[in-house]
A protein has these predicted regions:
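Positively charged n-region of N-terminal signal peptides that target proteins for export
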Residues: 1-4
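Internal alpha-helical transmembrane segments of multi-pass membrane proteins, especially GPCRs
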Residues: 6-9
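C-terminal motif of bacterial Sec signal peptides marking the signal peptidase cleavage site
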Residues: 16-19
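Post-signal peptide N-terminal segment of mature Sec-exported envelope proteins
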Residues: 28-43
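Second-shell loop/turn segments in exported
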Residues: 41-48, 111-119
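A cross-family detector of function-defining hotspots
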Residues: 52-101, 124-178, 184-188
Length: 188
């Protein structure tokens, strides 16, 4: 009986110590391979990627809108033609392409709620800490880098560049407001 009790006591101690030191790192929870997704030209949360055919997208989004309306649901979807670009907006994501480069497909994607695992409202430090091994540039939000934001905001942008793809995180009052992905070869 003493041997069994001793054996159980030893097992309890061994398992207790083996569980120590296994704290989850909060940064590891949000870790995503930006370089991999930049190479693919996509955001993991998004159904479409860079280079997608705009006509096919509009066709699919129009069908989704019709299905939602038939079911009595709302589906925000709009196509807006500008002088040089076309904007396709379905609520959570906004897609752009340049009219002169339509054959190259979608060249700019904007996530308004969540991008690369980061929810809207995440802090700039949270993203920097989750991606410590990647080089980035930090700049102020201005008209040229935030053309898609309605109205002027005072904030900053973290830019991660991988060859011809750029992933940017936009912050206003230290809260994530948008995440973008674009192709420098197909976007002016």
């Amino acid at each position: 009986m003493k041997k069994i009790f001793s054996f159980l006591l030893v097992l309890t101690v061994v398992f207790s110590f083996s569980a120590c030191g296994k704290k989850k790192d909060k940064a590891a929870e949000n870790k995503v391979d930006l370089e991999y997704y930049a190479g693919l030209g996509q955001m993991p949360e998004c159904d479409y990627k860079l280079g997608a055919d705009p006509d096919e997208m509009v066709e699919k989004l129009t069908a989704a809108e019709s299905s939602a309306e038939a079911a009595g649901d709302e589906y925000p979807f709009a196509v807006t033609e500008g002088e040089k670009t076309v904007r396709i907006d379905n609520g959570d994501f906004v897609y752009y392409y340049e009219k002169a480069k339509k054959d190259k497909g979608i060249s700019y994607i904007i996530a308004t709620n969540k991008g690369y695992g980061f929810e809207g409202g995440a802090s700039i430090l949270e993203i920097k800490n989750a991606l410590p091994e990647l080089e980035y540039t930090e700049e102020d939000v201005n008209d040229s880098n935030s053309f898609f934001l309605m109205g002027a905001i005072d904030g900053s942008v973290l830019k991660y560049t991988f060859k011809n793809r750029v992933i940017s995180f936009f912050f206003s009052e230290n809260e994530l407001t948008a995440v973008t992905l674009y192709d420098t070869d197909n976007w002016t």
